[in-house]
UniProtKB/Swiss-Prot annotation:
TM annotation in the entry: 2-22, 32-52, 61-81
Protein name, per record: NAD(P)H-quinone oxidoreductase subunit 4L, chloroplastic
Ubl conjugation found in the keyword field: no
Membrane-topology descriptor: Multi-pass membrane protein
Keyword entries, A-Z: Chloroplast, Membrane, NAD, NADP, Plastid, Plastoquinone, Quinone, Thylakoid, Translocase, Transmembrane, Transmembrane helix, Transport
A Pfam match: Oxidored_q2
Protein source organism: Amborella trichopoda
InterPro entries from the UniProt entry: NADH_UbQ_OxRdtase_chain4L/K (IPR001133), NUOK/Mnh_C1-like (IPR039428)
Catalytic activity: a plastoquinone + NADH + (n+1) H(+)(in) = a plastoquinol + NAD(+) + n H(+)(out); a plastoquinone + NADPH + (n+1) H(+)(in) = a plastoquinol + NADP(+) + n H(+)(out)
GO term, biological process aspect, one: ATP synthesis coupled electron transport
Family affiliation: Belongs to the complex I subunit 4L family.
Function: NDH shuttles electrons from NAD(P)H:plastoquinone, via FMN and iron-sulfur (Fe-S) centers, to quinones in the photosynthetic chain and possibly in a chloroplast respiratory chain. The immediate electron acceptor for the enzyme in this species is believed to be plastoquinone. Couples the redox reaction to proton translocation, and thus conserves the redox energy in a proton gradient.
A GO-annotated cellular component: chloroplast thylakoid membrane
An example Gene Ontology molecular-function term: quinone binding
Length: 101
């Protein structure tokens, strides 16, 4: 019973993240949507790991690696966005032509 609830919640999180990535024009919002996608993937990893083999912790350990990648992205992403904002005076995705210079 809890398996279905976890899958529905993670699919909602994943679809909200994909929708936000497609429609957002702000880099900060895109980073937040990327975090939603990574959290949905973590929920799926833990849920399927618990469902198929609760004695082995392969899904749990892999989700810890995904959390570490998300933490690095959360630390580096805003620094890159603030650097782009300082140079371009905008955080809009469609206005940052970094390869043009």
């Amino acid at each position: 019973m809890m398996f279905e609830y976890a899958l529905v919640l993670s699919s909602y999180l994943f679809s909200m993240g994909i929708y936000g990535l497609i429609t957002s024009r702000n880099m900060v919002r895109a980073l937040m949507c990327l975090e939603l996608i990574l959290n949905a993937v973590n929920m799926n990893l833990v849920t399927f790991s618990d469902l198929f083999d609760s004695r082995q912790l392969k899904g749990d350990i892999f989700s810890i690696f995904v959390i570490a990648i998300a933490a690095a992205e959360a630390a580096i992403g805003p620094a890159i966005v603030s650097s782009i904002h300082r140079n371009r005076k905008s955080t809009r995705i469609n206005q940052s032509n970094l390869l043009k210079k």
